[in-house]
Regions:
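Conserved ABC ATPase "signature" C-loop
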Residues: 213-214
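Conserved ABC ATPase "signature" region
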Residues: 112-129
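Helix-to-loop junction immediately C-terminal to a conserved catalytic motif
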Residues: 51
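Conserved ABC ATPase signature
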Residues: 134-138, 142
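Catalytic Walker B motif of ABC-type/P-loop ATPase nucleotide-binding domains
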Residues: 159-162
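Conserved ABC transporter NBD signature motif
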Residues: 59-67, 76
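The feature captures the beta-strand-to-loop junction immediately N-terminal to the Walker
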Residues: 36-38
């Protein structure tokens, strides 16, 4: 079953050059999909169109089989959660507890049930010991984990990370990647779509989509995408170190059937 279906999508800002021109793309339910692309490639615009934050001009987008339009937009938004780039801009509550509660309060969840949900999802992202902390006492990675807890508390079918690690230090980025991996374990049917520059994150995904000039330049598993190092360089994208190493070995006649560095070294030493 498809979580997201995009057919013949065309979009431009203020009659400027088209960001997308007849784009079609399907994302399967329960998959972890990473969208890569250089600045201006259309990655974040795609996320905003899927969530209904931008209006579709031509073509069609369906979420869980429901077409995005004025009639269905609120239903669509209830099915999708989004974590944005800047952790400070999305922290609404005075404390961690208040921030996770924000969406639940808007849905008139009873207080006793709300407390249970807050504790449950704070624990899932490792923030249960910080429930009464103010945002000024949290790191960027911790704030993003709170944002994720608030999204998960609403039990969406799809979670979109829109450059959610780009403003974080290495420790914060590692924390968010660990949370995403945990989400995959806990929520098997949840679809995760991550818009990012981080090629190392893409190693963890089921599918990688490379966008360039509003078109799908490459799509496939991490293995299928990162083996195309020459094409990725033309698209101004780096590749993960492990694939640089593997591709270099391949060009020198040494084929590897793994991307585990330790296994590669062991094989080379045989």
């Amino acid at each position: 079953m498809r979580a997201i279906e995009i057919k013949n999508l065309t979009f431009s800002y203020d009659k400027q050059e088209k960001v997308f021109n007849n784009l079609s793309l399907d994302i399967e339910k329960g998959k972890y999909c990473v969208v890569l692309g250089r600045n201006g490639s259309g990655k974040s615009t795609l996320a905003k169109l899927i969530t209904g934050l931008l209006t579709i001009q031509e073509g069609q987008i369906k979420v869980d089989g429901i077409e995005i339009n004025e009639k269905n937009i609120y239903d669509i938004r209830n099915r999708i959660g989004i974590v944005f780039q800047n952790p400070d801009n999305q922290f609404i509550g005075a404390t961690v507890r208040d921030d996770i509660a924000f969406g639940l309060e808007n849905h008139l969840v009873a207080q006793d049930k709300m407390d249970q949900i807050i504790n449950e999802y704070a624990q899932k992202v490792g923030m249960d010991k910080y429930l009464d902390k103010e945002p000024s006492n949290l790191s960027g990675g911790q704030k993003q984990r709170v944002a994720i807890a608030g999204v998960l508390a609403m039990t969406p079918d799809i979670v979109i990370f829109d450059e959610a690690t780009s403003m974080l230090d290495p420790k914060g980025k590692k924390e968010i990647k660990e949370v995403i991996l945990k989400m995959r374990e806990l929520f098997k049917d949840m679809t995760i779509l991550s818009i990012t520059h981080d090629v190392e994150e893409a190693l963890l995904a089921d599918e990688v989509i490379v966008v360039d000039n509003g078109e799908i330049a490459i799509q496939g598993t991490p293995e299928e995408v990162f083996i195309k190092d020459d094409l990725l360089k033309k698209l101004s994208l780096d590749i993960p170190f492990v694939y640089k190493f593997k591709n270099l070995l391949g060009k020198n006649g040494i084929e590897m059937d793994t991307i585990d560095i330790e296994k590669m070294v062991k094989k080379l030493c045989q």
